[in-house]
Amino acid sequence: MTGLSEGLRRTTSALLILAAASASRAQSFHLFPSAPSDEAAGSAAGDTGDAERPDSVGETPAPPKKRCVLIQCVTLPVPPADKIFNRGAGLWTATALGVGVVVAAQGPIDTPGHGFFFVNERFFEYDTYAGGSDKASHFIASATVADLLSDAYRINGLSENQSFALSLGATVLVGFFVEVGDGLTPYGGSAQDLTADALGAFLGAFAKRGGFDDVIGFQLGKVPTDSPPALETIPHLGIDYSHEIHDLNFKFAGIGDHLRSDPGPARYFQLSFAYLTKGYGYQPPVESRYQEIGVELGLNIPEILKAVGVNDSTWWGDTLLRAFRFFRVPYTQIGAYYNFKSRKWYGPGAPYHYY
């Protein structure tokens, strides 16, 4: 996708509009039983819950536990759903697909009068439109949406397998709608964009199903970059990816929890592998454009928020944690970055400079 705002706009729209979907009544469900974090609070289906049975006569029962996904909050434990498309799951699915239709329609509305066609954008080759940053953006956006939908389906009583299948299918279908819309613009639809969407959706849903979503994560960030003045005179197509960075994160907190070991202060850090491009998207292409990969050590902002009492038992807590799991905060990492064009390594400031 070129003319539209790619994965970032699609994910932002999805998070805002999906917040309107909520079930008709509070339910409870055992979410991710192997994880000891706040997000996994709950008890297995069929457990009556400690809150309902005081240990001794006269003891005040503990308040019921709650779990929120954006603005939908439920009381744990939740009974299994009697059908896959109950009211809550149906609303989330319909809203997700509705977002896809709305985003898909924006391109043809802005640039009407074009017949449908596909283009071969390829993936991460040097001479592609965005050097692969567009595909990384699609991947991360779809992984994030699949993660969100999976959680939403779980708190509406769906099983792990049902949540995996439905979140994967709905996210891929959203990507398909968007590419159909792109196919009716001057830029054309892209099978490579849809492939990146499908891979991201699968990994996002699979990480949630496998219970290791607290170990790996994906972030998209803005990196303010001063581009050369000469680029200001060259027409630009779509997004300027010179101001974006894409991260694959490995979280020490989750690793420690799964190993049943306290990582200590390392809990508040994460190891990231970054991908970024500079100078792409111009027409005609500029010779100075380049691609970089990097290794970073950065702050795990959601884990820091949890340490000060933010959790997913409130709508604002869950929304805040999700926002910082998706958005990479600038200047909270140090790293080294390899430039494929110059074949040189650069220091922590590389994402913010155009070499």
Where do the protein language model's features map onto the residues?
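Outer-membrane beta-barrel proteins
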Residues: D151-G157, A205-G211, F250-S261, I301-A307
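Residues on the lipid-exposed face of transmembrane beta-strands in outer-membrane beta-barrel proteins
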Residues: F202-L203, H246-F252, V295-I301, A336, ...
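Transmembrane beta-strands of outer-membrane beta-barrel proteins
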Residues: I216-F218, R267-F273, V295
